[in-house]
Amino acid sequence: PRRGDAGRATVDGTIKASPDEQFWFGQFRMGLWPKFYDNSAFASQKDLNSFWRQMTPNTGPYNDKVIADAVTDALKKSEGTVLVTHSQGCGPGWLIGTEAGNNLKGIIAFEPGSGFIFPEGKVPAPIPNNSFFGPTKAVGVPLSEFKKLTRFPILIVYGDNIPKTEVKNPYQDYWRAASTMAQEFVKAVNAEGGHAKVLHLPDVGIKGNTH
């Protein structure tokens, strides 16, 4: 809801005309504008032009719960679904995992950057980084809700050009902090009896993937 093919919102929103391609080029780890990273698998400048054209703005305020409730209702019509999420959509994905019941058979989350949930009282401290977004934070939910994420396997996948230690590049350091929080999330799920894992594609020989 309020973005892309579900963009006809039922609440008001304002869309600002802002040229922000340089920012997203860096944030999506394609490279540092205007140069691609040397190992980038992104095809060409021509394809980049097409990529910018398919990006759509929010047409109303972003709301994890609204998104999660909508997808959860759709899942009730299925006989078993593996939920695939990406980027900001991974946050609602964890909430869907606590709401969807037995129809949800697994979650594959590609590059979550925010929206991680933890049991109340066990939320990690914010992770400082050099990005434009400030420290990477998580939120707490009741343990009874969090434990619902242990009913099915969870795989979190990250691409290339994410450093293991702090760097000055604000875009890369954002993802360093995000992937660190993902590791903490996986530990928390598994500590409650779950089956969660983080996969960094370069670690298995798959290189050059952007966000």
Region roles according to the model:
Residues 84-93:
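Gly/Ala-rich beta-loop-alpha elbow adjacent to hydrolase catalytic centers
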Residues 112-192, 197:
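The feature captures the conserved acid-bearing segment of alpha/beta-hydrolase catalytic domains
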Residues 2-62:
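Cap/lid segment of the alpha/beta-hydrolase catalytic domain
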Residues 61-82:
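Conserved acidic catalytic loop of the alpha/beta-hydrolase fold
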Residues 83-84, 107:
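Conserved alpha/beta-hydrolase fold motif
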Residues 196-210:
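C-terminal catalytic histidine-bearing segment of alpha/beta-hydrolase fold enzymes
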